Amino acid sequence: MELGRAGPAGLLLLLLLLLAAQAAPERDPYRVLGVGRSSSQADIKKAYKRLARQWHPDKNKDPGAEDKFIQISKAYEILSNEEKRANFDRYGDAGESQGYSQHQQRQFHHFHEGFYFDESFFHFPFNSERRDTSDEKYLLHFSHYINEIVPDSFKKPYLIKITSDWCFSCIHIEPVWKEVAQELEALGVGIGVVHAGYERRLAHHLGAHSTPSILGLINGKITFFHSAVVRENLRQFVENLLPGNLVEKITDKNYIRFLSNWKKENKPHVLLFDHMPVVPLLYKLTAFAYRDYLSFGYVYVGLRGTEELSSQYNINVYTPTLMIFKEHIDKPADVAQARDMKKQLIDDFLSQNKFLMAARLTNQRLFQELCPVKKSHRQRKHCVVLLTGEGDKFADAYEAFLTFAVANTKDTLRFAHIYNDRQPEFADALLMDEEKYRGKSAVVILERRNNAGKIAYKTLEEAWQGSNEDNFILLDLLDQLRTDPGLLSSETVLADLNDELAPMFLIRWFYSTLDYILDCWDSLFHSNWREMMPLLSLLFSALFILFGTVIVQAFSDSSDTRDSPASEKKDTTAKTEKNDTSFNKESNSRVPKKGFVEVTELTDINYNSNLVRLRPGHMNVVLILSNSTKTALLQKFALEVYTFTGSSSLHFSFLSLDKHREWLEYLLEFAQDAAPIPNQYDKHFLERDYTGYVLALNGHKKYFCLFKPHRSGDEGGTLGACEDYDSSLHTEARGKSSCSPGSRSLKNKLHKLSFWMERLLEGSLQRFYIPSWPALD
């Protein structure tokens, strides 16, 4: 009896186990991708790409392809994440958090590892497999978005929703989204849905870091929707994406100007007459799609000031009327009228009237569309082109050609004209005898053979004047062409046409700059702050460094001003009385390391170490003195250079003029502006006084800078004044001085040496180069 009772229960349990075992492989990501548990990330990625290409719903029409593709995507999502993969290997579940402790999981894992419960049993809408079927046809993938959606956004705007699984807010906006998507799609707006769980790369590319998100795409530019998700806000958002100058409001005052612009713009002009005060969104979307071919205007027939316009074209004010005007503005070239203007009706109407009756070839794209390359015999199209000029001289020929084009409209014929002076290469290639057609118009019948520019053509033998005879000749050739395509016997290759209507470089640059500024402004206030943080960090860092430098410099200058009196007290009284400006320079120099100046004599013993083999970047400042002036000049020299002793690259020495006069005069020969050096026949040879000269010697680069004592009148002509002084820097009045040593104290010979040292450190002194250092005997 007990066995009988246990029999059905056992069979049910066995059946459940079999079903679970059968479903287990479908839930195992390794089996779904066909890889082993020890496979590397490269192998997993390779397997995913292969299976994704095989089971992609766009390529595989199998009814179960979408479910299989979702399983593949889920499996790759688990195995591509090391943490989820480790959880699955350990617990059979890819979740990041477990409901029980690891001990409990180990205890019960063996029991439940074969059981899988599908949440669809409870009809929860969170599983991607159970998402609304209305979204499935709008699903976007990264390659599809880049290759198709972005280029198509230059023809129509796109409204894109980013969603994910387990998103309660996504469920909340779903009814509104479905209604608006259906409504806007009928008007010509592109609709897209991105599942952030399976298209993480695309979601990141779009800048969507949370779900749900709604964004607009137009001209390749992304704009996020930030208002409440209601029908009116979404419609207004799409309308705001469109440029504001697509449709011009037309009244009795401006309709003639608007329609007459066909010649300047080289486009037909479209007018919509309606009793709605606001331009319909459908009309704006149509204007955006056809903006390269047509110009659009809107007439609100209920507005005062449109009576003349409505009366002239016999408009029914109760029915929307669409009119298209070409070369003649007194009457429309075509009319469409319907109580309910549908997108398909408008598209069919405009696609048949995209070009003027005899459009001017202003760029290569227009030429290729007017005269397409034949793909089959039935699609053969011949272009009749008038090569003419500008001005009243050619007006009659053009009007006659236009009349002929209007009277002979056929699907296989396209009429166009071109200005010879604006497209000289085109005209020269078709008119072999330029002298024959100089100052006249010519007609050419041509057929494009390939996209490389090869054409077959025939030029009318006589110039086009628009006479009846010319019309008969052209009409006869066109009739022959229908039966004998070989009539176009000449062939040539045409270069691409110049773009006559392209804006100037400055205008393009201005608009590009304006768009960039507007994008930055929009990004600053509406973009995700996570993306803006690097830019903001860089900006604030630059501002901090800039203002920090200014503040530190300001405090440094103020502290130097306060400290300068204390520095002056430490120096000698004689220095303070002589030159206050010199002290200001010294206070800003490097702080001396010692309380004295170490000055060594330059002799033949230390000559190599102190000059010839001096380290790169080091200089030896040498004072020239004699035995009689040694004490006074050394004291003054030490006082002048004291503030520069803190520099480790400067060395200080003195040279005895009595011992090494020839060495000094050899160096002075290389000083271009130095005083003439006497020779041995000069009676004043031994009377030249070089005491007080200072030479800054760079032993490594073999050059020196020269300081000469400040001289006055007589001797100044012989020895030369020190050109290294900048009189604009020192405006302190000086008394007249004699060049004779007896008339002026020796200590004044080194006057302003400190300023010369400043310029030496700045590198602004003149340099005198020598081939090699002479020996110091």
Swiss-Prot record:
Query: Disordered: where is this region?
Result: 558-589
Thioredoxin domain boundaries: 117-243
Glycosylated residues in this chain? 627
Where does the record place it? Endoplasmic reticulum membrane
Q: Which residues form the signal peptide?
A: 1-23
Q: GO annotations under biological process?
A: regulation of autophagosome size
User: Pfam families annotated for this entry?
Assistant: DnaJ (PF00226), Thioredoxin (PF00085)
Which segments sit on the Cytoplasmic face?
24-531
Membrane topology annotation: Single-pass type IV membrane protein
Keyword Transmembrane, does the record have it?
yes
What cellular-component terms does GO give this entry? Answer: endoplasmic reticulum membrane
User: Mind telling me which PANTHER family this protein's record contains?
Assistant: DNAJ HOMOLOG SUBFAMILY C MEMBER 16 (PTHR44303:SF2)
**Which protein are we looking at?**
DnaJ homolog subfamily C member 16
What is the species listed in this Swiss-Prot or TrEMBL entry? Gallus gallus
